[in-house]
Amino acid sequence: GLSKAALAKQSGMSEIYLHQIFAGRRNPSRSRLLCLCFGLGASLEEAQDLLRHCGCAELYPKVRRDAIIIFGLLHGMDLFTVNDRLFSEDEETLF
């Protein structure tokens, strides 16, 4: 399995923040949830399920930023690669 330390690193967040999310003491933003999806290596379907479950808007391919994120999820990119692509396309990064 993936340790909390490794998940935190791959998700671009601190272990403390990650622990607070899992303990229900934090209500992460849509972008933070997507960071977590990349850290977990989630599929697009799993990411959409998590967003829906947490009451966030699903990724929508006609929105440029979302399309870049979808591409990253479909191609198994890591969070940092997707963030670089978002930045280079003048879109808001995930963190």
Located regions from the model:
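Short, basic-rich loop-to-helix N-cap that marks the start of a DNA-contacting helix
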Residues: 25-38
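A short, Lys/Arg-rich alpha-helix, primarily the initiator
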Residues: 1-4, 80-95
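Short basic helix-loop element that most often maps to the first helix and adjoining turn
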Residues: 1-8, 35
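Key DNA-contact positions within bacterial/archaeal DNA-binding proteins
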Residues: 5, 16, 45
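Short, charged recognition helix plus adjacent turn
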Residues: 48-77
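Residues within the alpha-helical elements of helix-turn-helix
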Residues: 10, 39
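Recognition helix of helix-turn-helix/homeodomain-like DNA-binding domains
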Residues: 11-28, 53-55
